Design a protein with these regions (language model features):
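Substrate-binding N-lobe of the ribokinase-like
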Residues: 1-42, 254-257
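Short acidic, glycine-rich surface-loop motifs adjacent to enzyme active sites
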Residues: 80-96
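Conserved phosphate/ATP/ADP-binding segment of small-molecule kinases
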Residues: 94-189
């Protein structure tokens, strides 16, 4: 894996303590978690018969107070001044990734030459303007567009080019479920097919894509190669029940299992 720092907002509650315990177990720095007067956003999945029956959300989406935002951004800028190779902004529309915070993160990262990779949410993509990568799925693209698209190569390419032009985003990586992923950048369009397999649970597949993409870019891979690796990692994750973190060895095994044509 890579050295990872988590930054965001939490409450002073059980779910925050539980989160910090998990971070400690996985050797992830939690110093960027800013305590607030709101609950820690928590998603509880109810599983029955190996299927998700429902999900309970514990959250507040009210605007954050300026004092908390200032602490959060000060931390991000401090870390950028030290040594950060990539930033992932994962927007869940819970209040953290507002236009103020997201714009400030992109500007600060670019001042240090650090790429920003966005996992979008909602219809306001103005706040993502200027990002280096964005990784929407078809549903997220359709939440943005007035005229929804189908999951075809032609329509995905058209939507990706629109996103690049309108929001000045350099690279668009569209995750397309059974159709794999499509990477679009200036002068390049790449379709990377998924690998045939049995799918147990798609929970966390998109998170896997953006995490492995960021790790690859931070490690010096070209966009096309990082996207290929991210797609391969997602193919491992969807074979597992529940959210799952793919290991280095599992990724190596998946690479060894590729045919010469796929490689």
């Amino acid at each position: 894996g890579c050295d990872t720092i988590l930054a965001g907002f939490v409450g002073e509650d059980y779910h925050c303590r539980s989160l910090k315990e998990k971070l400690l177990e996985n050797k992830i720095d939690d110093v960027g978690l800013v305590p607030t007067n709101r609950p820690t956003t928590t998603k509880m999945r109810i599983i029955g018969g190996h299927q998700q029956m429902m999900r309970l959300d514990f959250e507040s989406t009210e605007p954050l107070e300026k004092i908390y935002i200032d602490k959060f951004l000060a931390f991000v800028r401090c870390k950028l001044a030290e040594s950060i190779d990539a930033i992932v902004v994962s927007d869940y529309a819970k209040g953290t990734c507002s236009e103020v915070t997201t714009t400030a993160i992109i500007e600060a990262a670019h001042a240090h030459g650090v790429p920003v990779i966005i996992d979008p949410k909602g219809a306001n993509w103005t706040k993502y303007r200027g990002a280096d990568y964005i990784t929407p799925n078809i549903k997220e693209i359709n939440e943005l567009l007035l005229d929804p698209i189908k999951n075809t190569d032609a329509e995905v390419l058209k939507a990706a080019h629109y996103i690049m032009r309108k929001y000045r985003i350099k690279n668009v990586l569209v995750t397309r479920s059974e159709s794999g992923v499509t990477l679009v950048r200036e002068g390049e369009e790449v379709h990377i097919p998924t690998r045939a397999q049995e799918v147990f649970d798609v929970s966390g597949a998109g998170d896997t894509v953006i995490a492995v993409l960021a790790a690859g870019l931070a490690g010096g891979l070209k966009g096309r190669d990082a996207a290929f690796l991210a797609n391969l990692a997602a193919s491992v994750v969807v074979r597992k029940l529940g959210t799952y973190a793919v290991s280095r060895e599992e990724l190596k095994e998946a690479l060894r299992g590729l045919s010469r044509e796929e490689a």
